[in-house]
Regions:
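Catalytic-core signal marking the mid-to-C-terminal active-site face
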Residues: 198-221, 242-351
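Phosphate-binding chemistry for phosphorylated carbohydrates and sugar-nucleotides
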Residues: 1-246
Length: 351
């Protein structure tokens, strides 16, 4: 029926060790489709969900096939464009959908909604949120930190780390407001239908039905999403439901909501990672003294004016003596240059 969601399992039980050449982490970090025996099928123009071995992370991807490459008369193949919707785009889709439903339900002024993220969220994501009036809060790396931020700052807090680990949280108060409004709306509809004339009743019921549908959608979302930290299966059901509610929104349209800036992540081996102290949700470095100033200077290299698309930060690993370096810029070449210089600065200041 039209209410069913058809999910086709692409991998099989004999595909080898869990997460080997597959899973959300493989897809996100390598920017390519899974490569297990059972998945050597065409992903072209298909909307695909990829979860990790213990089903707490989720990313979506698709492959768009373009024009054929190669000269006439030679062996040619069609150019393939890999498209990824990571945790940032999961957050965007869910948050924008819920904002729309709150507006239609007349609850936008009663229930606050926002997105919690980490410093690893792409700069294009945060600018897109700002441009569209979506409130965000940045938390320290780690899903427990983002979960806490979403819970503390918003009545409805949406969060997904870039790797697809996350969920949406509805506060007890938000649930009560939605449920009360739903009961009140059903009561009003019942009364209006008995009191109004047939023509007036028809007009009024159209208005009420729009609100009622939004309230029922919010109620269904609460029942679908798992507020525990990471349940990829319930997240798949929510995403599929949203895409369907949005008129079977094409994957390409979702993916094109904004274009990610090129990024690079590296690790630098150091003698003692604890010499680095960070603040501003790990986006700035407090110690060792002078390192943050050097990073700021590097970001301005080869640029007459400050480039707002350039960003870099360093943070110590939580488990080993390495420093993690994150760099973001308008193009991959600039990313490489900045990353190399930041790595050199880390070695200079931390060894």
């Amino acid at each position: 029926t039209t209410k069913e969601i058809a999910l086709v399992l692409k991998n099989g039980p004999n595909d080898g060790p869990v997460n080997l050449n597959c899973g959300s982490d493989f897809v996100q970090k390598n920017q390519r489709a899974p490569e297990t025996p059972s998945t050597r099928l065409s992903f072209v123009n298909q909307r695909c969900a990829s979860v990790d071995g213990d089903c707490d992370r989720l990313v979506y991807f698709s492959i768009e096939e373009g024009e054929e490459e190669g000269k006439e008369g030679e062996n040619s193949s069609k150019k393939q464009n890999f498209m990824l919707c990571d945790g940032d785009k999961l957050s965007i889709l869910i948050a924008f959908f819920l904002i729309e439903q709150l507006f239609l339900a007349g609850l936008a002024h009663k229930i606050s909604l926002g997105i919690a993220h980490t410093a690893y969220s792409n700069g294009a994501f945060t600018k897109f949120c700002e441009k569209n009036g979506v409130e965000t809060v940045c938390a320290k790396t780690g899903v427990k930190n983002v979960h806490k931020a979403a819970e503390e700052h918003f009545d409805i807090g949406v969060y997904f780390e870039s790797n697809g680990h996350g969920t949406a949280l509805f506060s007890d108060e938000a649930v009560k407001v939605i449920e009360k409004e739903l009961v009140d709306e059903l009561t009003r509809m019942s009364v209006e239908q008995h009191l109004r004339k047939e023509e007036e009743k028809h007009i009024q019921s159209v208005i009420l039905t729009t609100k009622l549908k939004a309230l029922l959608t919010l109620k269904a979302t609460i029942q679908t999403i798992n507020p525990a930290i990471g349940d990829a299966i319930s997240s798949v059901l929510l995403i599929e439901g949203i895409l369907r509610k949005k008129g079977n929104m094409p994957f390409q349209e979702w993916h094109a909501m904004y274009r990610d800036l090129p990024t690079k992540q590296t690790k630098v081996k150091v003698r003692d990672r604890t010499v680095i102290e960070c603040f501003d949700s790990e986006r700035k470095c407090l110690k060792p003294e002078g390192l943050q100033q050097r990073i700021d200077e590097i970001l301005l290299l080869d640029s007459c004016v400050k480039n707002n698309n350039r960003r870099a930060f360093v943070r110590p690993s939580g488990t080993e003596d390495i420093v993690r370096v994150y760099v973001e810029a308008s193009d991959a070449e600039t990313c490489e240059k900045i990353s190399t210089k930041v790595e050199e600065a880390v070695i200079e200041f931390c060894n």
